[in-house]
From Swiss-Prot:
<dbReference type="InterPro" id="IPR036259">
    <property type="entry name" value="MFS_trans_sf"/>
</dbReference>
<feature type="glycosylation site" description="N-linked (GlcNAc...) asparagine">
    <location>
        <position position="377"/>
    </location>
</feature>
<keyword id="KW-0458">Lysosome</keyword>
<dbReference type="GO" id="GO:0072593">
    <property type="term" value="P:reactive oxygen species metabolic process"/>
</dbReference>
<dbReference type="GO" id="GO:0048666">
    <property type="term" value="P:neuron development"/>
</dbReference>
<dbReference type="GO" id="GO:1905165">
    <property type="term" value="P:regulation of lysosomal protein catabolic process"/>
</dbReference>
<dbReference type="GO" id="GO:0051235">
    <property type="term" value="P:maintenance of location"/>
</dbReference>
<feature type="topological domain" description="Cytoplasmic">
    <location>
        <begin position="505"/>
        <end position="519"/>
    </location>
</feature>
<feature type="topological domain" description="Extracellular">
    <location>
        <begin position="63"/>
        <end position="75"/>
    </location>
</feature>
<feature type="topological domain" description="Extracellular">
    <location>
        <begin position="360"/>
        <end position="416"/>
    </location>
</feature>
<feature type="transmembrane region" description="Helical">
    <location>
        <begin position="175"/>
        <end position="195"/>
    </location>
</feature>
<dbReference type="GO" id="GO:0009100">
    <property type="term" value="P:glycoprotein metabolic process"/>
</dbReference>
<feature type="transmembrane region" description="Helical">
    <location>
        <begin position="141"/>
        <end position="161"/>
    </location>
</feature>
<feature type="topological domain" description="Cytoplasmic">
    <location>
        <begin position="332"/>
        <end position="338"/>
    </location>
</feature>
<feature type="region of interest" description="Disordered">
    <location>
        <begin position="1"/>
        <end position="25"/>
    </location>
</feature>
<dbReference type="GO" id="GO:0045333">
    <property type="term" value="P:cellular respiration"/>
</dbReference>
<feature type="transmembrane region" description="Helical">
    <location>
        <begin position="213"/>
        <end position="233"/>
    </location>
</feature>
Length: 519
């Protein structure tokens, strides 16, 4: 909080020693402080590797799927990509609940082991004689299931940091996550040098090529992560003021000693924050999904151009997110997390409002049939098909523009490139600010109680948004066009802003709500 000096983080802190309670009698020594932050940094790495595990194969899934199973089509590709989020959605509350009652090492090691095994399965999906595409579906779903440990990571960091440290720690977590999404495709590009044939070990039926090398690297990094967790991670817990506490996971039951009444969690604030986080991830999924189809339709780009330019834009988006994460750490100390959350949604609303088409200039119409249409039929993952095919096709005769099958192309004005880029900057600023502030506030609202299951539900809401967002924008954009699509998104953002305004006073730290400390 504002009245706590930053130097206090490094000083030994003496608990108040409340009668009848041993929990608050601990002192945070310098050794404990170093061990606590060493453990937190191990979980930063875990978050980074989880993101890399998702993004390191995202651009090569389609060609690999075609190679192992000729019956796979674009629709099945959408299921393969969505299976990651489905797996994470199911696993998050389970791992979160587990972490509430047992040492966090257990769900972390089990979840990472599942991811390692799933990545190895992905490398061997070419071996079965039939139904290979379903093995890939299972592999990606299990990788997502292993990524459910995000709930454990966030709950650990929330419990191992004081209120003053929390925003910085959560921002660092988001930074590592964003870096994982950025660097994953970079690793994939490097492995492309190996080629499709690569090297084969017949004895173990292992093919190391441009498709399998990335997942084998992810599996190796996962094993290193398990080793670090086993030997470095320690159970740490501090209260909102930073005083050392005994971890709930190891606290012995003692019915003879009275317990300090902790108060109840504000469930209204909990539900509201889950809704807010759902909208945050929904917005990102919508924007990510619509990016390439929109540029194909509005600017008559070829698929090669769209993949190149939009890929550059997404990398810039990730870099901008990292800068925003670093910026909010400083800004939150001056204006608070709630103001940043509200301001972030306002910026996002302005971004989508700018994307609304105006004027009397219309996009180029594509009169010819285009088999690989720019219509976003399922998810952003289908656009990966264009990335792989673009390097093999002759684009000199490829029809470009807004396909006539989308009737709105005939009467909807074009979105000018300046509009598009301005909106990208604004959305790229607002989204990461809203993301980190939403689960930072969430962790503070929950207070000193174990947060595993609650963080699991938060991660589940985010996974659901990543599944539903592409479905929503695909149908609305295809049949009604960008004006309706972005207008509805603006409406959703306005409703979310009103929700934040309604619960604004409730979005305070647990200790502040019960007046144990002053905000």
């Amino acid at each position: 909080m504002a009245n706590l000096g930053s130097e206090a983080e490094r000083e030994p802190l003496l608990g108040p020693g409340s009668p009848g309670s041993r929990e608050w009698s601990e002192i945070e020594t310098q050794e404990h402080y170093k061990s606590r932050w060493k453990s937190v940094r191990i979980l930063y790495l875990t978050m980074f590797l989880s993101s890399v595990g998702f993004s390191i194969v995202i651009m090569s899934i389609w060609p690999y799927l075609q190679k192992i199973d000729q019956t796979a089509d674009a629709s099945f590709l959408g299921w393969v990509i969505a299976s990651y989020s489905l797996g994470q959605m199911v696993a998050s509350p389970l791992f979160g609940l587990w972490s509430n009652y047992r040492p966090r090492k257990e769900p972390l090691i089990v979840s990472i082991s599942i991811s390692v095994a799933a990545n190895c399965l992905y490398a061997y999906v070419h071996v079965p004689a039939a139904h290979n595409k379903y093995y890939m579906l299972i592999a990606r779903g299990l990788v997502g299931f292993g990524a459910g440990n995000v709930a454990v990571v966030r709950s650990y960091i929330a419990g191992a940091t004081s209120l003053q440290e929390r925003t910085n720690a959560m921002a660092n977590t988001s930074t590592c996550q964003a870096l994982g999404f950025i660097l994953g495709p970079v690793f994939q590009t490097c492995f492309a040098l190996i080629g499709e044939k690569g090297v084969t070990w017949d004895i173990i039926k292992l093919q190391v090529n441009m498709y399998t090398a990335p997942v084998l690297l992810a599996a190796f990094l996962g094993i290193l992560n398990i080793i670090l967790i086993l030997f470095i991670l320690r159970e740490h817990r501090v209260d909102d003021l930073g005083r050392q506490c005994k971890s709930v996971n190891f606290q012995e039951e003692n019915t003879d000693e009275p317990q300090i009444p902790e108060g109840s969690i504000d469930q209204v604030a909990v539900v509201a924050t889950n809704i807010v986080f759902f909208v945050v991830l929904f917005i990102f999924a919508v924007y990510e999904t619509i990016l390439t189809p929109l540029t194909l339709d509005m600017y008559a780009w070829t698929q090669e151009q769209a993949v190149l330019y939009d890929g550059i834009l997404l990398v810039a988006f990730g870099v901008e997110a990292v800068l925003v994460f670093m910026g909010v750490k400083l800004l939150s100390k001056k204006i608070g997390e709630r103001a940043i959350l509200l301001g972030g949604f306002v910026v996002v609303w302005v971004g989508f409002f700018i994307l609304l088409p105006w004027g009397n200039q219309f996009p180029k119409i594509q009169w010819e049939d285009l088999h690989n249409s720019s219509t976003p039929n399922t998810t952003f993952g289908e656009i990966i098909i264009g990335l792989w095919n673009s390097s093999r096709e002759d684009h000199s005769e490829q029809p470009t523009g807004c396909p006539i099958e989308q009737t709105w192309c005939l009467y909807t004005p074009v979105i000018h490139l300046a509009q598009f880029l301005t909106a990208a900057v604004l959305i790229g600023t607002g989204y990461p600010a809203c993301s980190v502030m939403s689960y930072t506030l969430y962790s503070k609202v929950l207070g000193p109680k174990p947060q595993g299951i609650y963080m699991g539900w938060l991660t589940t809401s985010g996974s659901a948004a990543r599944i539903l967002g592409p479905v929503f924008i695909s149908h609305v954009y295809t049949y009604l066009g960008p004006r309706w699509a972005f207008s509805l998104v603006c409406g959703i953002v306005v409703l979310t802003i009103l929700l934040i305004g309604a619960v604004y006073k409730r979005l305070v730290a647990f200790s502040v709500r019960y007046m144990r400390i002053q905000e």
